[in-house]
């Protein structure tokens, strides 16, 4: 296993340097010899400091400094597209690529953010409150990118099957 950002991992699979990568689904189609298996869908939420009152996500977003999820990441691009589609102008405080750091800043009252509700954050920290985006909710797909099965070794095929089976159990 090696850590890395989604684009780097995708490039390594495409180059044949690694067999499988767990990544955020990119906003573009894969080449014909690459396959995608969705493992989870994570809804985006507006997170605010616990003491901030109100349930209207649009009002909260316009009234408070915005901590932006990095636009260089696939998830951050989704947030950026959402804001543009909604014709929303935010008071940007900073831009970060680390979700945990974003949550910590919100927890400390620095501002608000739109982030995916990941498995790590099934429950938000005590000082953070999540506000649903209602019918505007969007998701990011987390999954596996790999080469077509005929290009994989038997142990890798077996691993892929086990991961897919486990993901099906949880969904």
Language model features with spans:
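Short acidic active-site motifs
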Residues: 8-9, 56, 100-102
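Conserved functional loop/turn residues at catalytic and ligand-binding sites
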Residues: 12, 16-17, 38, 65, ...
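Flexible hinge/capping segments at coil-to-helix
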Residues: 33-71
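A late-sequence structural motif
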Residues: 131-171
